[in-house]
Amino acid sequence: MKRELKITLAAALIMLAVTPCFAASKSKKSKTKVRTINVAHTVTNVPYDFLDEKGNADGFEIAVLKAVDELLPEYEFKFHGVSDEELLIGTESGKYQVGTKGAWITEERKKKFLIPSNPLAASVIGIAFRAENADQIKDLESFAKFSGKLIPISPQSAQFSVIQEFNEKNPSNQIKLVPSDVFDIADSYLWVLEDRYDAYFVLKLSYEKNVLKETGPYHQFADKLAYVPYKGIPTWPLFNKKESELAAAYDKAVQTLKENGTISALSQKYFGEDVFNFVSE
């Protein structure tokens, strides 16, 4: 009886000693401040950033950022669907800490925003051309040899700089880069079919949506057009200039998501392929 009493008293003393430790740990965790991060995103950029049928934020970039959020207990991401203009102005001013819109890097954006080390997604870009020339045009290099006669591109477009870069690397096999007065030429596919130009530099997703998809406005020409990808252009989240600590946390989380296969799996879900396979180091 005395032995049982001693054991009971000993157990009680241990519980009294340990309980304050658990209480302190629980109190410390509950007092940890979780900072709300306002993330602006575009609403119609399928499959990168958009609103689903219920009005919820969806898309590949959104999904990656949600996965990033799960790895950062000190932050809670709140998503805001906004216009392209509101995203840029709001992120620069600090109304939003992050903006995501499938953005390519430009010199102007480097001046206005903090660009992290790791991209968020990638846009696959290439050329659409007449299917009858498919035996001669296999890539951008063979197109340059074929004629290099490309639909004019606005100097304000990121595509312009991509072709500039190609020409710099291929001084003896250049593409005819003609500046356009407008950002987007509505009849580009028709101009190619009419032999006015021999190719149209366009995003793969745009080609699939407008030509290959049965409801696409140019689907009737699907058998007369062909497409070859050139490369994947990384897209980046835009951070407010003051958010260096947040950007560093993002970079660390994205690296983890790359290594554990999450980003590749999400790319397969939203694009049907791993778009980073087209991105050269």
Where are these regions (language model features)?
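Bacterial N-terminal signal peptides that target proteins for export
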Residues: 1-9
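Ligand-binding clefts/hinges and TM-proximal coupling segments of bilobed small-molecule sensing domains
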Residues: 23-25, 75-78, 154-177, 220, ...
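Extended ligand-binding regions for polar small-molecule ligands
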Residues: 62-72, 131-134, 141-145, 149-152, ...
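Acidic, polar ligand-binding/catalytic clefts
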Residues: 66, 78-144, 223-229
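A ligand-binding cleft/hinge motif common to bilobed small-molecule-binding domains
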Residues: 86, 92, 100-112, 161-165, ...
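Extracytoplasmic small-molecule ligand-binding "clamshell" domains
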Residues: 28-103, 181, 260
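Bilobed "Venus flytrap"/periplasmic-binding protein-like clamshell domains
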Residues: 43-46, 54-70, 127-174, 178-184, ...
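Periplasmic-binding protein-like
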Residues: 42-44, 121-126, 214-254, 273-281
